[in-house]
């Protein structure tokens, strides 16, 4: 006499078995509507035939490697007319389509000699084999896992000779009783030439366009093209000081420095409507999927005379905390009639005031009318009036070679300096950084 617990367990087990049996029954019924117990109406059709035809027009190519490479397009067929309750296996092999060895010359495939001895016959058995006819008919049969190789290494891979043309062939074998061949099917539009690397660029383009697993190659190509374009000299690559980092022009764009030598950069000349490319990644607070060709600096370079204390480095757009220009004792204003130094000074922190713009004293040309609406990271700095100005000096004016070309000082009036100071303060106004 069984206990109540045993009876409940038996009912639960029976319920689970019934559920599994019903799932199997529904599986068998899925493709039964296409079935024919007599197998007289058996039909096999090629899936994606239009895509195969596009490749055939260009002479399709398939890569063969030592470790094996999968095919694209993937060979898929739809089947109808099988006995839904009978067991079948699907097999795939490849036969040579002609008696030529091929070569790619001047953009086209031409016969290139006698073929090599045919490789040992290799047959690929579909991993779902054997299975009911209903299973094969419910959905297209895909040979997506078959791999083509040029080495005889087994493992279910198909060995092919490179530079030979092949045609896939599908076989259907009835199993589970007296085994017999039902049918063999081949499709001329699936012919291809086995290669170790693609020869026709149009074939490569089609593979990348339609193969979802080839998008990485497309991304790599676009990344290389993007890098090449960014490295080409354009309107936005103006000569300037690399140590100034990122500029904030009046047009609202971000432009990196062009000079790779921070201590020997040319004069900075950036008109208010220059052609620098806008950076949507910085405006939209979203990082670019590709690395920027301009590497952000991790530390400020060292310059003579503590020039880094005069002009702060802006590392990246992430740390725009405030905009302020620290004061520096070597910031020397000059009058409008002061001539700029003719030589390259060793003090890049010397500045001159000319027409309301700020010009590095160490440069010949300076920043003339180039920073009208453009500002650096800084705030208006208040300087103690000085009673001297900078003028050009010759190399003979200093006894030490370290100070060749250095500036000499002459006394000027406080009122003259106050005028220069007001121009200096007026040209430096706070700028609100873009919201991050």
Swiss-Prot record:
Summary of subunit composition and partner proteins: Monomer. Binds DNA as a monomer.
Entry superkingdom: Eukaryota
Role according to the record: Involved in the transcriptional regulation of genes required for mesoderm formation and differentiation. Binds to a palindromic T site 5'-TTCACACCTAGGTGTGAA-3' DNA sequence and activates gene transcription when bound to such a site.
Keywords: Activator, Developmental protein, DNA-binding, Nucleus, Transcription, Transcription regulation
Cellular location(s): Nucleus
Annotated GO MF terms: DNA-binding transcription factor activity, RNA polymerase II-specific; RNA polymerase II cis-regulatory region sequence-specific DNA binding; RNA polymerase II-specific DNA-binding transcription factor binding; sequence-specific DNA binding; transcription corepressor activity
Gene that encodes the chain: Tbxt
PROSITE patterns to which the protein is assigned, alphabetical: TBOX_1, TBOX_2, TBOX_3
A single GO cellular-component term on record: chromatin
Record-linked SUPFAM superfamilies: p53-like transcription factors
Organism encoding this protein: Mus musculus (Mouse)
Name recorded for this polypeptide: T-box transcription factor T
PANTHER family: T-BOX PROTEIN-RELATED, T-BOX TRANSCRIPTION FACTOR T
Classification of source organism: Eukaryota, Metazoa, Chordata, Craniata, Vertebrata
UniProt xrefs under InterPro entries: p53-like_TF_DNA-bd_sf, T-box_DNA-bd, T-box_sf, TF_Brachyury, TF_T-box, TF_T-box_CS
């Amino acid at each position: 006499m069984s206990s109540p617990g045993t009876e409940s367990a038996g009912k639960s087990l029976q319920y689970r078995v019934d559920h599994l049996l019903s799932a199997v029954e529904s599986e068998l019924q899925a493709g039964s509507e296409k079935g024919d117990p007599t197998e007289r109406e058996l039909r096999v059709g090629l899936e994606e035939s239009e895509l195969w035809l596009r490749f055939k027009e260009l002479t399709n190519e398939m890569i063969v490697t030592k470790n094996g490479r999968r095919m694209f397009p993937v060979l898929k067929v739809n089947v109808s007319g099988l006995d839904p309750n009978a067991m079948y296996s699907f097999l795939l092999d490849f036969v040579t389509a002609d008696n030529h060895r091929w070569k790619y010359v001047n953009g086209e495939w031409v016969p290139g000699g006698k073929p090599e001895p045919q490789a040992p016959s290799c047959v690929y058995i579909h991993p779902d084999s054997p299975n009911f006819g209903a299973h094969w008919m419910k959905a297209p049969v895909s040979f997506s896992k078959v791999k083509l190789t040029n080495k005889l290494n087994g493992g279910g891979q198909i060995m092919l000779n490179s530079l030979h043309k092949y045609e896939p062939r599908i076989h259907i074998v009835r199993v589970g009783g007296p085994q017999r061949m039902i049918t063999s099917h081949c499709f001329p539009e699936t012919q291809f030439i086995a290669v170790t690397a693609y020869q026709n660029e149009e074939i490569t383009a089609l593979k990348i366009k339609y193969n979802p697993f080839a998008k990485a190659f497309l991304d790599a190509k676009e990344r290389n093209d993007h890098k090449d374009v960014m490295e080409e000299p354009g309107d936005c690559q103006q000569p300037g000081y690399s140590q100034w980092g990122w500029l904030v022009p009046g047009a609202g764009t971000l432009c990196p420095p062009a000079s790779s030598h921070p201590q020997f950069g040319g004069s900075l000349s950036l008109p208010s409507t220059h052609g620098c490319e806008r950076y949507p990644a910085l405006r939209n607070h979203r990082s670019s999927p590709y690395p920027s060709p301009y590497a952000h600096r991790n530390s400020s370079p060292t310059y003579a005379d503590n020039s880094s204390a005069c002009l702060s480095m802006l590392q990246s757009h992430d740390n725009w905390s405030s905009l302020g220009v620290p004061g520096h004792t070597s910031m020397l204003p000059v009058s409008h009639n002061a001539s700029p130094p003719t030589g390259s000074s060793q003090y890049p922190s010397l500045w001159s005031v000319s027409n309301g713009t700020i010009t590095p004293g160490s440069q010949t040309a300076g920043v003339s009318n180039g920073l009208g609406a453009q500002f650096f990271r800084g705030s208006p700095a208040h300087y103690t009036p000085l009673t001297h100005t900078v003028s050009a000096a010759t190399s003979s004016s200093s006894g030490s070679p370290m100070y060749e070309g250095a500036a000499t000082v002459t006394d000027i009036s406080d009122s003259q300096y106050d005028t220069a100071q007001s121009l200096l303060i007026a040209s430096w106004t706070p700028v609100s950084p873009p919201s991050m």
